[in-house]
């Protein structure tokens, strides 16, 4: 299978390099990843600037742009072969609940929504690289299981979160997104006209069946996410009112 790998932490980050090593054992790997960290960059496209692309080795591109830029340019211009699937990660840090709105990891995967297989975003619930090899092996195992599952609609993105563990985790559950509370307020830097964005809110909707609950119980969470943001229930009520 031909896989395009991307991320938001940058090409030289430990997470994507671990995933390259693991998935290249069985698959043909192409890489298009940002030059710099673009965490929380969401689905931004750089439409107001020229974007520099460096071909650092065969089928590996380092792009001075956003995660979405990377996958968009790779699929529409750089890579002539037919790519089967986009996999984004391994992100160092969780993408649970509302995090997916801001996530550059999820956004990179989302750019692969028109391919044969559902795009996949993978995150490790820690910024510590100690257990990254276990996470990469778990990612490879889950990837193979997903590809074998013919019931997954290719118009769905799969958001995977892997608990941090000293052991290789293979147990996984399909979950729904939880929900975070109000984020920590932005903070002004003393005596300067600069501000820092506050931390994400604590989980509020974290009951059984959510990604929060599942990962807290040391089980890998796989959340199917649809691209259609329409609230169909409200739409139906409005049309019938």
Pin down the residues of each PLM region.
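Glycine-rich phosphate/pyrophosphate-binding loops
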Residues: 113-134
């Amino acid at each position: 299978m031909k896989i395009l790998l991307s991320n938001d932490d940058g090409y030289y980050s430990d997470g994507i390099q671990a995933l390259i090593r693991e998935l290249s054992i069985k698959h043909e790997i192409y890489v298009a990843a940002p030059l710099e960290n673009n965490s929380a960059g969401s689905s931004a496209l750089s439409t107001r600037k020229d974007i520099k692309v460096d071909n650092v080795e065969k089928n590996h591109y380092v792009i001075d742009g956003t995660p979405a830029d990377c996958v968009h340019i790779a699929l529409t211009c750089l890579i002539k072969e037919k790519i089967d699937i986009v996999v984004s990660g391994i992100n160092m840090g969780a993408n649970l609940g509302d995090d997916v709105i801001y996530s550059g990891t999820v956004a990179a995967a989302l750019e692969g929504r028109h391919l044969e297989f559902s795009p996949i975003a993978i995150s490790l619930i820690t910024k510590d690289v100690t257990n990254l090899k276990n996470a990469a092996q778990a990612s490879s195992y889950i990837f193979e299981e997903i590809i074998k599952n013919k019931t997954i609609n290719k118009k769905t993105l799969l958001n995977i979160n892997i608990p941090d563990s000293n052991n290789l985790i293979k147990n996984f559950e399909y979950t729904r997104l939880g929900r975070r509370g109000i984020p920590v307020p932005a903070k002004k830097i003393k005596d300067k006209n600069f501000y820092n964005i506050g931390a994400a809110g604590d989980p509020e909707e974290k009951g059984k069946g959510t990604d929060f609950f599942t990962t807290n119980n040391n089980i890998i969470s796989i959340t199917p996410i649809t691209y259609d943001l329409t609230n169909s229930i409200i739409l139906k009520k409005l049309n019938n009112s």
